[in-house]
UniProtKB/Swiss-Prot annotation:
This is DIS3-like exonuclease 1. Keywords: Cytoplasm, Exonuclease, Exosome, Hydrolase, Magnesium, Nuclease, Phosphoprotein, RNA-binding. Residues 365-431 form the CSD2 domain. Its cofactor is Mg(2+). InterPro entries: Dis3_CSD2, NA-bd_OB-fold, RNase_II/R, RNase_II/R_CS, RNR_Ribonuclease, Rrp44_CSD1, RRP44_S1.
Length: 1054
């Protein structure tokens, strides 16, 4: 029987008054204990995971241990952990949402042997707070009382160890109850886990950092920064309009000087501000870090400053360029932080000379983060000299107003600086990507498909699904070497003369049950991560490359959409959604499908499915396939024309296809040539996504997962408009339709690169496409700007996107709802779905950033060992696409590289080009105009560089010990580069790009073979981050994007 209590909360209002609120608090005789030793499992109603059977004790951390040592409690070796509700709520209220979410994710993770016990709702565990008792003492007392009850509840069969940092609690409770031990966390590790070296090192690091903070707080220091305002003052100021809330974004090129705050939830329509707010200098930043949600106070207009328009090195100071800034813009200072964005940071220790220069205080070291946007971090360690050549991970603990730098602690070593695996590990950590192998529990949920036990269609599924194996010609069109085929197509003529178009997608949700171990893991990963030389799958290969891959000639489960189209106008008459069984007849490559579409039938010899057919059957099947591809293309043209009429955009994205040999080694990297069949497949997928979006929204208007692409801010198009104007083009950005038409008309007859660059600039002006729950915003905000569709979602790639898995479940639920059948499984509420969407959006950004950074890593490693003065491959043609105060930005089509080329060097000399067009540095000055920049020397020579001029560029690498290496561009001639032997750029680029990846990998392998004894740290790192063993690095690689500055297509498209 429930018992009712009254819980008193004291809240402070915006006006500063204390408000007393009384809430009802109900206590239950039984709450889930999640223990296999439970004597009353039915009464406890266990739901979810249970604690492991193979433990010697249960450990219960108190609230302070959970707050300070959560990263150690995350170690998978530590099992049988019981987190009390009291401790979890303390984390939520005192450490903020980020750490609380980290704790929640730990509790959800099936790989970790830990559970949540709701002690404050259990009748025997709940203790009211006594008069005069501090919150901290009550929390410790409540947790101990719950630990005693839990021990007796398990019939005294499992010892309980409560770990706490409260010495009084250890003295008071240490020997009070037999079977319940109360000790410090340090003693717990010493006695129970003496061999867990990593945990001991991390614990020592945390303790040392805490002691340093306590010592600093006791010492008298002058304040380096103003104190942050109290939360109630910040909230009141935001509500009144005095303060502005937003996310801090630091300029990586001027990290010490410039940061910007973009308003949250504000637009030009409801705010006087039409631009970001500039935060100038570290003092005004007031201890906020890139990504923090901050509160800003605007400065008076006479104190506003302009953003820097000059090119600068990442480590330059405020006066490095000596150039005037742009027009003054809204400028402010940070007065408070609402949410910290602290995470794991990869750092490098200072050189030996720098360590020695710090003198007697050498145990406190300033380490430099790999990310330029993060300030140096002070940590306490005695390993500085030992770890000088390694990249290590640290965490920030605090940043007091009396300290110039934040304080942190050492976590672990990643790998040697410059080592390929160490650099890849750095990219993963910096993007918060965890790629540990799938666990045994997850793999046990997977179906079996072996020669001894082959997988077969079950009779039950045959009864429930529509069987298309004999009635439909189903085929796939994919890149060469593709293993995870998650979409196939079909088209046929119906008896009434109309056409039937079908899109058939792998039925992943048949194999991945909601809230199963593999479902939770896929939800955590959210996407497959593609790096330049490998990929980390969202699902195990038995699904992604086998049973969920719609391979040719085998039976597979699918979810299908089939439209009946008018035979002449292709108008959609009706649509059918449902589960099917298919057998794909052909697994075509894009190139082969295009050849068939163009009438070149000789390509049929390269299609395996035709090889064993007699001439008559071969001819008949070939005619059937050619007709199907042609009809699909005709339908796609019609669908695309309809979207074009509504303003669909075609933006610039450069893709490359990786060509593999029979041994799965890389053979070539070929830039993806635009083929009409690409558009055909894409249009069919867009059509399917659009119709599924409409269906799930109609059935679940408040909890459907859709994808929106908001219109961009008009001010972001200013550079695009000005650049187009320089070539005599007018870009109308009032709507997606006018923008699309303008870009189509901005075609220079003599230089197609101009249109590519204009489309790239349009892409950079775009806002990101995001997943959202339909219950969280108004219907008019559902629109997808880039695709010109009122509703859109992702349905067609469930093998590599968790969003598509959610959409498949929603579609199945919608179909059941139409049939008035019971909906199986619990759908996400609007609140939970919105939280999931935020997580998926975050992981998608991480995937894009890691892909871009890994590509840049390979570019740098390729050029690093080449002498730019003598190596022909370091010279290339470049196109100027932006003018700055002291240089230009250049795009190199041959390698897809964008970068800065200086026209004034650090010595103040400017570039000069003589009669032979070769450049040299001389005293002089630069004069910048809107679309050009002129360099004039003191002896009267001058050279002018215009937007979209072709110049000859030398590529070299700027090596950095603490950060990633970067490509450096130097203009060596103001004339276009003449390719030797009159080779065309697009013909030579595949060979060069192949060498880029192939040579880097080869050099790494040679270095590894030459190294007789590997460093243990590298081995540990390899085990943690390498997902596959025993095969080539390229086994999993099917396709990568050749990024310039952005992952273009993912920002706006399918």
């Amino acid at each position: 029987m429930l018992q009712k209590r009254e819980k008193v909360l004291l809240l402070r209002t915006f006006q500063g008054r204390t408000l007393r609120i009384v809430r009802e608090h109900y206590l239950r005789p039984c709450v889930p204990c999640h223990s296999p030793l439970c004597p009353q499992p039915a009464a406890c109603s266990h739901d979810g995971k249970l604690l492991s059977n193979d433990v010697t004790h249960y450990v219960i951390p108190d609230w302070k241990v959970v707050q300070d040592y959560l990263e150690i409690l995350e170690f998978p070796e530590l099992k049988g952990i019981i987190f009390m509700q009291t401790a979890c709520q303390a984390v939520q209220h005192q450490r903020g949402r980020r750490q609380y979410n980290k704790l929640r994710n730990l509790l959800k993770d099936a790989r970790h042997d830990c559970i949540l016990f709701a002690n404050e709702f259990q009748q025997c565990c709940y203790l009211p707070r006594e008069r005069g008792e501090s919150m901290e003492k009550w929390q410790t007392r409540s947790i101990y009382n719950a630990a005693v009850w839990y021990y007796h509840h398990c019939q005294d069969r499992m010892p309980i160890v409560m770990v706490t940092e409260d010495e009084e609690a250890i003295q008071q409770y240490g020997s009070e109850t037999e079977g319940v031990f109360v000790i410090s966390f340090k003693n717990y590790l010493d006695n129970f886990w003496p061999d867990l070296k990593a945990a001991h090192e991390l614990c020592d690091s945390i303790l040392q950092s805490r002691r340093e903070r306590e010592n600093e707080s006791q010492e008298s220091h002058g304040k380096e920064y103003p104190e942050h305002l109290p939360l109630e003052v910040l909230e009141a100021g935001i509500k009144s309009g005095r303060y502005i809330q937003g996310i801090l974004n630091v300029n990586k090129h001027r990290a010490q000087i410039e940061a910007f705050v973009r308003l949250q939830g504000a637009s030009s329509k409801d705010s006087d501000l039409v631009s970001d707010i500039l935060i100038h200098g570290m003092k005004a930043r007031n201890r906020s870090i890139h990504g923090d949600v901050v509160v800003v106070e605007l400065l008076p207009k006479n104190e506003w400053k302009g953003r820097t328009v000059a090119l600068c090195e990442n480590d330059c100071d405020d006066k490095a360029s000596g150039e005037s800034p742009s027009e003054p813009m809204p400028t402010g200072r940070v007065v408070g932080i609402l949410q910290k964005n602290w995470r794991d940071y990869v750092v490098t220790f200072p050189s030996k000379e720098e360590v020695q220069s710090q003198g007697k205080n050498a145990q406190k070291i300033l380490v430099t983060p790999w990310d330029y946007r993060i300030p140096k971090i002070r940590i306490s360690t005695q390993q500085a000299e030992t770890l000088q050549d390694f990249r290590v991970v640290v965490r920030i603990d605090s940043w007091e107003s009396t300290s110039v730098y934040p304080n942190g602690h050492f976590v672990r070593v990643l790998g040697r600086i410059g080592d390929l695996e160490g650099e890849i590990a750095t990219i993963l950590v910096e993007n918060s990507i965890s790629v540990i192998p799938f666990s045994e529990a997850q793999m046990c949920e997977m179906p079996v498909n072996t020669p001894e036990n082959p997988w077969k269609v079950s009779p039950e599924e045959e009864q429930k699904r529509k069987d298309l194996r004999k009635s439909h010609l189903v085929f796939s069109i994919d890149p060469k070497g593709c293993e995870d085929v998650d979409d196939t197509l079909s088209v046929r003529t119906l008896n009434n003369g109309n056409l039937e178009l079908g899109v058939h997608i792998a039925d992943v949700t048949h194999f991945v049950a909601p809230n199963s171990y593999i479902d939770i893991e896929a939800r955590t990963r959210a996407t497959t991560y593609y790096l330049a030389d490998r990929r980390y799958d969202m699902l195990p290969s038995v699904l992604s490359a086998d049973l969920c891959s719609l391979l040719g000639g085998v039976d597979r489960y699918a979810v299908s959409i089939m439209w009946e189209l008018d035979k002449a106008s292709y108008e959609i008459k009706k649509v059918w959604y449902g589960r099917t069984i298919i057998r794909s007849a052909y697994k075509l490559f894009y190139e082969a499908a295009q050849e068939l579409l163009d009438g070149n039938l000789s390509v049929v010899d390269d299609i395996p499915e035709f090889k064993d057919l007699d001439e008559k059957s071969r001819q008949a099947k070939l005619e059937e396939l050619v007709w199907a591809i042609g009809k699909l293309t005709d339908i796609a043209r019609h669908v695309r024309a309809k979207r074009d009429g509504c303003g669909a955009l075609e933006l610039e994205g450069v893709e490359v296809r990786v060509q593999l040999d029979d041994k799965k080694n890389i053979h070539d990297l070929i830039p993806k040539q635009p083929l009409e069949v690409h558009e055909t497949v894409a249009e069919c997928m867009i059509l399917a996504n659009h119709w599924v979006a409409k269906k799930i929204w109609e059935s679940f208007p408040h909890q459907a997962l859709l994808r929106q692409h908001p219109p961009p801010h008009q001010e972001f198009f200013s550079e695009l408009r000005e650049c187009a104007k320089a070539k005599g083009f007018f870009i109308d950005t009032r709507s997606n339709k006018t923008l699309a038409d303008s870009l189509d008309n901005a075609n220079g007859p003599h230089d197609p690169i101009v249109n590519r660059l204009l489309r790239s600039m349009a892409t950079q002006a775009m806002s990101n496409a995001l997943y959202f729950s339909t219950g969280s915003c108004a219907e008019e905000e559902f629109h997808h700007y880039g695709l010109a569709l009122d509703k859109y979602t992702h349905f067609t790639s469930p093998i590599r996107r968790y969003s598509d898995i959610v959409v498949h479940r929603l579609l199945m639920a919608a179909i059941s709802k139409d049939k008035k059948m019971e909906i199986k499984g619990n759908l996400f509420s609007n609140k939970d779905l919105e939280e999931l969407c935020r997580h998926i959006n975050n992981r998608n950004r991480a995937a894009q950033h890691s892909q871009k950074q890994s590509t840049e890593l390979f570019q740098c490693m390729y050029f690093k060992d080449k002498d730019p003065a003598t190596e022909e491959r370091c010279i290339s043609d470049g196109v100027i696409y932006s003018i700055r105060a002291n240089g230009v930005l250049v795009f190199i089509p041959r390698f897809g590289i964008k970068g800065a080329a200086y026209l004034k060097n650090k010595d103040g000399l400017v570039i000069s080009c003589g009669p032979d067009s070769c450049s040299e540095w001389k005293p002089g000055s630069l004069q910048r105009f809107q679309n050009k920049i002129t360099s004039t020397t003191t002896d009267g020579e001058s050279v002018t560089f215009h937007l979209f001029d072709h110049v000859t560029v030398r590529i070299s690498i700027q090596v950095s010990r603490c950060h990633s290496d970067t490509t450096r561009l130097e203009i060596i001639s103001n004339k276009p580069y003449k390719i030797p032997n009159t080779e065309l750029i697009h013909q030579s680029s595949p060979l060069l790009k192949s060498e880029l990846v192939k040579e880097v990998t080869k050099s790494v392998e040679e270095a590894q073979l030459a190294q007789e004894v590997k460093v243990n740290i590298i081995q540990e790192e390899y085990q943690e981050y390498c997902q596959t063993k025993g095969r080539s690095l390229y086994t999993l690689l099917e396709e990568i994007r050749d990024l310039a500055l952005l992952d273009v297509s993912n920002n706006y498209g399918i």
